[in-house]
Each structure stands twice: as structure tokens, then as C-alpha cells.
Amino acid sequence: FGLLLGICLIVQIVTGLLLAAHYTADTSLAFASVAHMCRNVQFGWLIRNLHANGASFFFICIYLHIGRGLYYGSYLNKETWNIGVILLLTLMATAFVGYVXPWGQMSYWGATVITNLFSAIPYIGQTLVEWDWGGFSVDNPTLTRFFALHFLLPFVFAGLTLVHLTFLHETGSNKPLGIPSDCDKIPFHPYYSTKDVLGFVLMLIPLITLALFSPNLLGDPENFTPANPLATPPHIKPEWYFLFAYAILRSIPNKLGGVLALAASVLVLFLIPFLHTSKLRSMTFRPLSQILFWTLVANLLMLTWVSN
């Protein structure tokens, strides 16, 4: 999945650059510029659909990558793991600020609700929110800075990816048995390159199918309506890949408690290398750990479903 994530990153940067060439980061023009792209720009509809659905595949790959790392004990490469968690946080931030850019109803209200969570921080909360917004509500300055961040963060992500790979190169990658694989090493090409092409094709086919046949399947219909600060949508919710965290946030009545639980649901990954007590690295021969692992997976799927 690491290779697939790299491919996702390249696809997102290339399609994103092409979209940025036609996009206008202004509240009065943003929605119209996206509509113009889909109607008048050569293959603009396809580029936009690939970019929007590419984000979903990016998250599918990163969640599978993290799940596999948990299952096979890859978190014992502490530096690689911690940079991986920082990469996840960067990806989440990038996806969030990018969701605001088309300036539809859910873009606007999603930005308002999520940035407003900073106000739960004692003493500095309200100041922080107003500083983030560039005013007293989500408006033109917010859109401008969010687009700037959305343009910048993928390159930060690419830099962190190189650091991630550098630390991985120190130890070598892990495998299902969780034992050193020095004696089993084989040439990268043609063995791994062939294996990777299979994964690439298996990801590309569903992505292209989704982008061509049902590009709006995972999007929110509210985003076909231009942002209107005077009309609140009946259900404010983020994209599907944030729903598990959003369910945790919404399930706690206290605002600060919800924000802390939301943050903890992702930041708990930093603790995992310190919680490993088994003499075996991988879960291959640990049935009780396997039960806990699959319970976690079921939990995340149920949270996503409930939140939807």
C-alpha cells in the first residue's frame, strides 16, 4: 500500500495543479470557477472527478496501510511509525482545507463547524478561531488561506514521505512473520515491480470506474448549492473518511470533551509502539490480539456507518 499511496500522491498533485490553473480563490468566483472547469475546460470534468475520488482512494490506502502496520507490528520501527502518523495528520489537514475550496454549502458549513471546534480550547480558543478565519466568520480571507494551505501541504507531505522512506531504509521493511528477512532478500526488479504493477492496476480500475460512471457517489449533494451563510443544511457532516472521528466528536455532549476525544482517536497511534508487550512482533500467532484488532476494525466501520 506504500507504493499505492505514492501513486495517489502523484495523481493528486498532478490533477491538483491542473485544477489550480483554472480555480479562483474568491468567495464570489470559486463555485463558478469549478463549474466552468467541468463545462468548458478540456477534460476538466475528468480531472476534477479524478481529484475528488482520488482523495477517497488515498484514504482507503492509508487506512489499509495503517491497519496492516498494526497487525504485523510495523510500529516497532518507532521513527518510521511516528512520521507515518504525522503523514496521516497532514493528509487529514490537506483533505479538510481542500474540501472548502469549491465553496458549496457543505464546504462552507463544514469549515465553519470544524474550525469552530478550536474555540473549545480554554483562554485562547476564540482568538485562535478568529485568527484562523481572518475575521468574525468564514469568509473570503478564510477561503484564500485554505486554498494556499491546500496547495502547499501536498508538497510538505511529499517531503515527509522521503523522511518516512529514509527511516524505513535504516531497518528494512517488516513482513508477516515479524522476523528479519536478510536471508530472503530478492532483487526489486522484476519481482517487486511486477507485484506492485498488480496493486496499481487493482487500484486504478475502481478509481477510473468511479470517476467515469458515478463521480458523485461519495460526495454530498449539498455541495451542488453555492455557499449561503444564511441557510444551514439539515445535516452537516464531513466526507466519509472523517466520519469515524466525527461520530466520536458528536457522541460527547461536552464541547471540549468531544474535541479531546476526536483528537485522541487519531493521536492514540503515537502511543502504540509503547503499548507493545508481547514477545512476538506480528499478530500472526496471537489469536487474542487478532480478536481485539478485528473488533477495532468493526468499531471503526460501525462508527462510520452510524455517523452517516
Curated annotation (Swiss-Prot):
Residues the entry annotates as binding heme b b566: 65, 164
Bilayer topology term: Multi-pass membrane protein
Keywords: Electron transport, Heme, Iron, Membrane, Metal-binding, Mitochondrion, Mitochondrion inner membrane, Respiratory chain, Transmembrane, Transmembrane helix, Transport, Ubiquinone
Tagged with keyword Coiled coil: no
Any Gene Ontology biological process: mitochondrial electron transport, ubiquinol to cytochrome c
Pfam families assigned to the protein according to its UniProt record, in alphabetical order: Cytochrom_B_C, Cytochrome_B
Compartment list: Mitochondrion inner membrane
One MF annotation (Gene Ontology) recorded for this entry: metal ion binding
CDD domains, A to Z: cytochrome_b_C, Cytochrome_b_N
Residues the entry annotates as binding heme b b562: 51, 150
UniProt cross-references to SUPFAM superfamilies, sorted A to Z: a domain/subunit of cytochrome bc1 complex (Ubiquinol-cytochrome c reductase), Transmembrane di-heme cytochromes
Keyword Transport tagged: yes
Cofactor: heme b
Note: Heme 1 (or BL or b562) is low-potential and absorbs at about 562 nm, and heme 2 (or BH or b566) is high-potential and absorbs at about 566 nm.
Family per similarity comment: Belongs to the cytochrome b family.
Function (record text): Component of the ubiquinol-cytochrome c reductase complex (complex III or cytochrome b-c1 complex) that is part of the mitochondrial respiratory chain. The b-c1 complex mediates electron transfer from ubiquinol to cytochrome c. Contributes to the generation of a proton gradient across the mitochondrial membrane that is then used for ATP synthesis.
Subunit structure: The cytochrome bc1 complex contains 11 subunits: 3 respiratory subunits (MT-CYB, CYC1 and UQCRFS1), 2 core proteins (UQCRC1 and UQCRC2) and 6 low-molecular weight proteins (UQCRH/QCR6, UQCRB/QCR7, UQCRQ/QCR8, UQCR10/QCR9, UQCR11/QCR10 and a cleavage product of UQCRFS1). This cytochrome bc1 complex then forms a dimer.
Entry-linked PANTHER family: CYTOCHROME B
This protein's name: Cytochrome b
Source species: Pomatostomus ruficeps (Chestnut-crowned babbler)
Gene name, Swiss-Prot/TrEMBL: MT-CYB
